Amino acid sequence: MKNYSKNATHLITVLLFSFVVILLIIPSKCEAVSNDMQPLEARSADLIPEPRYIIDVPPRCPPGSKFIKNRCRVIVP
């Protein structure tokens, strides 16, 4: 008879522990789902830092050419 009560105590302990774990996991899963359901603009606004000033630097041209009107042009001597 003692063996049955020990098994029952162990079973109840395992069930209580799993119940507590489930209670801890479910709210975090729901929060993740609610974050996924937000519009893309709302989520990306949190991730993107403030815009930095972009300096328009012309591309480098090979030797013997210059950057003229958005293209590298070969200068004929």
UniProtKB/Swiss-Prot annotation:
<keyword id="KW-0732">Signal</keyword>
<protein>
    <recommendedName>
        <fullName>Secapin</fullName>
    </recommendedName>
</protein>
<dbReference type="InterPro" id="IPR020128">
    <property type="entry name" value="Secapin"/>
</dbReference>
<dbReference type="Pfam" id="PF17521">
    <property type="entry name" value="Secapin"/>
</dbReference>
<feature type="signal peptide">
    <location>
        <begin position="1"/>
        <end position="32"/>
    </location>
</feature>
<comment type="function">
    <text>Nontoxic peptide.</text>
</comment>
<comment type="similarity">
    <text>Belongs to the secapin family.</text>
</comment>
<keyword id="KW-1015">Disulfide bond</keyword>
<keyword id="KW-0964">Secreted</keyword>
<dbReference type="GO" id="GO:0005576">
    <property type="term" value="C:extracellular region"/>
</dbReference>
<feature type="disulfide bond">
    <location>
        <begin position="61"/>
        <end position="72"/>
    </location>
</feature>
<feature type="propeptide">
    <location>
        <begin position="33"/>
        <end position="52"/>
    </location>
</feature>
